[in-house]
Amino acid sequence: DDVTDSVGQAFLAHAMQCAKCHDHKFDPVPTRDYYGMMAVFSTTQLAERKASFLPEESKEDFGLFAGLIQSKIASYDKQNAELNEKIKRLKKEEKGNAKVGDNGLDPGDEASQSRIFKNLIRHKIELDRVQPLTHAVYTGKTIVRQNVRGRIDMPEKPWQKGYYDSDVIYSGGDVYSKGDTVEPGGLSAAESLGGMNANPFPKGQGKRRLALAKWIVDEKNPLTARVMVNRIWSWHFGRGLAGNPNNFGGTGELPTHPALLDYLADWFMKNGWSVKKLNHLILTSETYRRSSRHPDPESISEKDPKGQLYARFLPRRLVAEEIRDAMLRVSGELNPRVGGIP
């Protein structure tokens, strides 16, 4: 469910989960489309795998940082062992009716133990950061775990192997209410609007995702290029040409400059879907380089109170990374070298 909805919002600017239990109330997204896209990922398992360092990353810095964290973990492990020994000793010293608490610690030691456990967890998380990982598709063996008290559904074809021969629509989103079968696919409305070839997706394991990826970046797809351009525009101007970058549906906002959105989408595809080139085009444009001060502020405030005409550059809220880099830059502590500790 999460993968289907994330793909829908990121590349198609549609919240797919709205069509999980019923046809979308505001957009032409039937339930069949939702389960068709979900069928693309029905044979997919995600896992964390170790990845190699990038060429520009500083392995030496990562090694030093990992060593520092390991030394902290060792120190806390030692403190924890000392506390455990103290607990054993105090348990042996119980006399009369005055018993030691359940854990054998006084309030001060309890606070120390809590601090040690919290720091151990924090440093182990920090240690994970220095190990490059990637979220990839798991292709190993699947261990099936079952709840012995749960409801048992006998498979229709017990010896079917490799991949599901069919996926179904769950009526009302209930996994126990199986409805019509559905084939892997994309959004039918996008195919009809863009004149795309509505070829059925292959059923083979691994081929479904490739088919969806090709469908998403098809030049006839009326959504993807516009969605990506609108999203990148919003990074630089604080808002997109079409409002919410994740909502191109009926509840979203109409584009303020539809011709510009179409032009940039066409330019984006003709330039190999290069985000770097699109960033360069936007950042070197007269629109982006305009001052936030207009020579006639009263007139522009009356004619364009929301700044939708881009007669001046409206200040936008900085993200955390930009604030961090700005503070390091003005203090002279920014390291311009690529790679190293994040």
Which role fits each region the language model picked out?
Residues P28, L64, S71-P342:
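Primarily short, surface-exposed interaction patches in extracytoplasmic proteins
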Residues D1-D77:
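Sequence context surrounding c-type heme c attachment/ligation sites in exported
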